[in-house]
């Protein structure tokens, strides 16, 4: 029985390796050496590519890890990989996803969707959607501390499509892994800010209620090279619903 199971396991691994090698022709990949061995950064892949991969241990939902969460996440990544308005990049090791970053369109009827519409109304030459959101960036617990999140963000934004976009990231402290890192909320916030700044994001002031709920929460944004300065100015104005007044208006 053990020999049969081992043989099946070898055939499964060989099949996965063959499938991945076939999909290499349509996937943008970059090999990266780490202290734990070589990994592959991948993006612009199909749903079938995801199906050939397992989920790394310690990769769940936000800072929680349960098998069912990892399994659910794999299904989500598989489905969104086929969406034209969604961008996904992964860190792959030994045919398993050990990290990923997901960029999505703003939710319908949200404040960010309204800002997207306002930007398109003022600058109709911009492609819809012009505003995107970094929905999630996760790294498997054993693969943290290797600089992979920084490398993955840089790899994602090598895609020139983002030079025509504004990408926001809403950082909410209830999603942070404070327990395992031992960091205070403000220290974790600083760590995240440095991470996003390395990929071209900037800190932005906003009166958004969800972000303002906790002092350590923050909003950052990355402006593509092809976004007009006037559109950047309008974006910043739209981050506050308070009436804009000039000097001397009180």
Locate each region found by the language model:
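Active-site-adjacent loop/helix micro-motif of nuclease/hydrolase catalytic cores
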Residues: 111-115, 144-149
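Glycine-centered loop/turn motif at secondary-structure junctions
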Residues: 99, 147, 200-202
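Short, histidine-centered active-site or binding-site loop motifs used for metal coordination
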Residues: 136-138, 172-173
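A conserved beta-strand-loop-helix scaffold within acyl/acetyltransferase catalytic domains
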Residues: 69-132, 137
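N-terminal amphipathic/basic-hydrophobic helices that include classical n-h-c signal peptides
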Residues: 1-27
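Conserved acetyl-CoA-binding loop-helix of GNAT-fold acetyltransferases
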Residues: 139, 145-161
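Terminal substrate-recognition subdomain of acyl/acetyltransferases
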Residues: 18-70, 164-250
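Short amphipathic alpha-helical segments and helix-helix/interface helices
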Residues: 77-78, 153, 193
């Amino acid at each position: 029985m053990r020999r049969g199971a081992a043989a099946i396991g070898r055939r499964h691994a060989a099949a996965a390796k063959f499938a991945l090698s076939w999909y290499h022709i349509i996937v943008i990949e970059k090999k990266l050496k780490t202290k734990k061995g070589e990994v592959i950064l991948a993006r612009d892949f199909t749903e079938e590519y995801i199906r050939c991969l397992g989920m790394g241990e310690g990769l769940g939902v936000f800072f929680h890890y349960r098998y069912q969460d990892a399994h659910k996440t794999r299904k989500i990544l598989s489905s969104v990989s086929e969406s034209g308005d969604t961008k996904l990049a992964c860190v792959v090791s030994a045919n398993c996803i050990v990290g990923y970053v997901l960029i999505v369109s703003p939710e319908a009827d949200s404040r960010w969707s309204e800002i997207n519409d306002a930007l398109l109304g003022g600058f109709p030459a911009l492609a819809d959607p012009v505003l995107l959101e970094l929905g999630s960036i996760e790294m498997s617990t054993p693969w943290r501390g290797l600089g992979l999140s920084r490398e993955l963000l840089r790899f994602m934004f090598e895609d020139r499509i983002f030079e025509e976009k504004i990408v926001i990231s809403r950082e909410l402290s209830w999603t942070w892994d404070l327990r395992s890192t031992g960091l205070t909320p403000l220290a974790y916030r600083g760590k995240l800010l440095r991470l996003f700044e390395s990929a071209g994001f900037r800190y932005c002031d906003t009166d958004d209620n969800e972000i303002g709920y906790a002092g350590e929460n923050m909003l950052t944004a990355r402006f593509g090279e092809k976004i007009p300065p006037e559109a950047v100015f309008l974006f910043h104005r739209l981050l506050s619903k308070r009436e804009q007044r000039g000097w001397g208006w009180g």
